From Swiss-Prot:
GO terms for cellular component: Cul4A-RING E3 ubiquitin ligase complex; cytoplasm; membrane; nucleus. Zn(2+) binds at C310, C313, C378, C381. The lineage of its organism: Eukaryota, Metazoa, Chordata, Craniata, Vertebrata. PANTHER family: CEREBLON, PROTEIN CEREBLON. Keywords: Cytoplasm, Membrane, Metal-binding, Nucleus, Phosphoprotein, Ubl conjugation, Ubl conjugation pathway, Zinc. The gene is CRBN. The keyword Nucleus applies. It comes from Pongo abelii (Sumatran orangutan). One of its GO terms (biological process) is protein ubiquitination. Residues 305-413 form the CULT domain. Transmembrane segments: none annotated. This is Protein cereblon. Component of a DCX (DDB1-CUL4-X-box) protein ligase complex, at least composed of CRBN, CUL4A, DDB1 and RBX1. Interacts directly with DDB1. Interacts with KCNT1. Interacts with ILF2. Interacts with TRAF6 and ECSIT. Pathway: Protein modification; protein ubiquitination. (S)-thalidomide binds at H365, W367, W373.
Amino acid sequence: MGNHLPLLPAESEEEDEMEVEDQDSKEAKKPNIINFDTSLPTSHTYLGADMEEFHGRTLHDDDSCQVIPVLPQVMMILIPGQTLPLQLFHPQEVSMVRNLIQKDRTFAVLAYSNIQEREAQFGTTAEIYAYREEQDFGIEIVKVKAIGRQRFKVLELRTQSDGIQQAKVQILPECVLPSTMSAVQLESLNKCQIFPPKPVSREDQCSYKWWQKYQKRKFHCANLTSWPRWLYSLYDAETLMDRIKKQLREWDENLKDDSLPSNPIDFSYRVAACLPIDDVLRIQLLKIGSAIQRLRCELDIMNKCTSLCCKQCQETEITTKNEIFSLSLCGPMAAYVNPHGYVHETLTVYKACNLNLIGRPSTEHSWFPGYAWTVAQCKICASHIGWKFTATKKDMSPQKFWGLTRSALLPTIPDTEDELSPDKVILCL
């Protein structure tokens, strides 16, 4: 069964395979109220509720060399902090995971820019934090929830006699840059500086006014240089995070600052994991070793790449950035695994176009409990784009939305916004 074969209901009849053009999206509107429990998708309840959970974490020293086993069937560019659900059937993989559970529970996920690529240069360590074994018709199945930990550079790949790949990797460090004003400020006064936390809301007028004054004073030392204040703000982590948060609030109006990481490194990875970009751009983000540089690149992508097209057709627009909304605590996009073991990073949008629906709605193995899914294909090339989700109860909101798989989407710059062609996207690196 191919990796891109969509999940279909178990009882498929000939009449269920009918292909119809979707008409609902033409009248679709952004839901004003969402009463869906956004914690359900992140818990991956479709894997089962009785998974054995592990605590603690395994972190390797920066620049250290490690030998880590590789899960070969995971064709995904994992971002640190991103959750990776897995269903493993092959005896080799089942045996490998069992051994990992007895050790440090860490395996390597290699970052391939495409399926044809034979050797990966970068990747991410993944640590198992939930585990379950079961049997289905005599076949042993392992269900796993893992989380990305650290970036690495691949030094060597070798295959053992049992067929398991071992990767010798170098753990990549995170470069923490000093404040943009550090070069012109007196070091003796650094300990006297006050960095107030940003107020959660504007209701606390006193704190908010103090915050505004702090923001104005933040770059006052720029007057001592030949460069303007705004130039320094372009490389200030706090300023970059605020600009990205404004973009994220367009996807989730109820987004709260305390639900996002306050650390620039963790925040940059959180944003990278929910950006609907192709593998080429994602590997570029994974290679970057500085949170500030990563944030600048992410903000550039969010501002420029406002259209999402079919990756196969390249010119057939499926949706736009304005249609994205969040239905999960992780944000508008997260990774889910289907019963065949294939992982789909799925983006939620409330409107999509140029799609045909295949078959009838099914609630089997639904990633969003309470919603039935229908396979969606590109109207032009018939490639699998994702699913249409429809509510099974009338009191649920939203009543319908789309889940688009990231691997089928190509981020592009609309011609009206930029003269560059999609294959000449210049990112702020």
